[in-house]
Amino acid sequence: MRWDDGSYSLRMTLQVNGYVSPYPVDPMPDWVAALRDSAAPVWLFAYGSLMWNPEMPFAERRPAPLRGWHRSFCLYSRDYRGTPERPGLVLGLDRGGSCQGMAYRLPQDGLGAAIDQVWAREMAGEVYRMRPVSVTTPEGRIGAYAFVVRRDRPDYAGRLSLDDAARIIAVATGGRGTGRDYLANTVRHLEELGIADGPLHRLHERVEALAQQS
């Protein structure tokens, strides 16, 4: 199906781990749809839950630092980890710094279905855009695609101070649980993957301290 502007659309309701998003899945641009038939390898850069819970088939995974972007709790969540009245915060990939993540090569067999699957998971709510990036892996430098935040969207929180972010996360609860649990699980999974993220560790410590005070 195509929108009036010619872009390819996955008109579906997004459901991840039993939670149904209130948002439609964003239209898929033609250049992304063309990747579904790509003869060249298609790599995705993962910085958050895609690293430890990809929910998509993949043929290969490599550690991959990305320069020029960093992992940050920079997006308001009014459903998954918060409510419209009390928004929470979720991870995004924002400009500046660097980010240690994972690069996934999607399988050539069933490539289109894999791209559709990850698009349906990531592209709800008009808060991300998919863009090409260059990452370094142990086997060399490769081109990949990453889902980065859209700074023009109202749910973009910007660069909050440590205390401001901690106060939001410590009390936020949404359809998929508390912001506190989301942050703790993120830190734990990063540690299991051998990834040190100082800002997230400091944020986690501050959130836990606030929780002990309440």
Locate each region found by the language model:
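A glycine-rich, hydrophobic/aromatic-adjacent loop/helix-cap motif
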Residues: 10-214
